[in-house]
Design a protein with these regions (language model features):
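Active-site-adjacent structural elements in enzyme catalytic cores
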Residues: 1-130
């Protein structure tokens, strides 16, 4: 990877924001497991705190970390459409920060189809991004 890519990974690990491409738009990302980092997204966008964010993950194996009681049809959708522009709204695990979900009992999960976004998620390793 490039020095800019390595810097983006370091910024995410430090609780900062980065812009990253997906297959549809550029997103503003932060460590979704870090409420202080998530708050920076809301501040940067001027987004109301009760509007949930989408958590980008690098694959199916990260779903159970973020969601519980995932129905069989959701796994079928993941298999058919991930990576890609499909966000699944699932029941969140108890530890998922309310800052991410807007205080809701659900979390939106997505595996982006852009190779740079996927590599950024893989390199981040200690947590997904938003």
């Amino acid at each position: 990877m490039t020095p800019d890519f390595d810097r983006a990974v370091a910024l995410l690990r430090a609780g900062e924001l980065v812009a990253f491409p997906t297959e549809t738009v550029y997103g503003l990302g932060a460590d979704a497991a870090n409420p202080a980092a998530v708050a920076k997204i809301f501040a940067a966008k001027g987004r109301p705190a009760d509007h949930p964010l989408i958590v980008h993950i690098c694959g199916h194996d990260a779903v159970d970390r973020w969601a519980e009681q995932v129905p069989a049809f959701a796994w079928e959708l993941m298999e058919a459409f991930w990576p890609g522009p499909l966000t699944l709204i699932l029941k969140k695990q108890a530890w998922v920060p309310d800052a991410v979900t807007g205080g809701q009992e659900t979390v939106g999960l997505r595996v982006p189809g852009h190779p740079l976004a996927l590599e950024l998620l893989r390199q981040r390793m200690t947590g997904p991004t938003l």
